[in-house]
Amino acid sequence: MRELIRLVSSAGTGHFYTTDKNKRTKPEKIEIKKYDPVVRQHVIYKEAKIK
């Protein structure tokens, strides 16, 4: 059961990525380091629900 999620930048720029994850095997929230083009550096992105 894969669900769409949104990865929101912790830098506060409003930039986000969308992806999906398997809620059955990974029930915890995702935190991953990705590139934020607004601040032009790698920052931590945290999982949020798609509205």
From Swiss-Prot:
Pfam families attached to this UniProt entry: Ribosomal_L33 (PF00471)
Coiled coil: none
Keyword Ribosomal protein: yes
CC terms in the record's Gene Ontology section: cytosolic large ribosomal subunit
Biological process (GO), any one: translation
Keywords noted in UniProt: Ribonucleoprotein, Ribosomal protein, RNA-binding, tRNA-binding
GO molecular function: structural constituent of ribosome; tRNA binding
Family indicated by similarity: Belongs to the bacterial ribosomal protein bL33 family.
Miscellaneous section: Surface exposed on the 50S subunit.
Assembly behavior: Part of the 50S ribosomal subunit. Cross-links to the P and E site tRNAs.
Name of the protein in its database record: Large ribosomal subunit protein bL33
Gene: rpmG
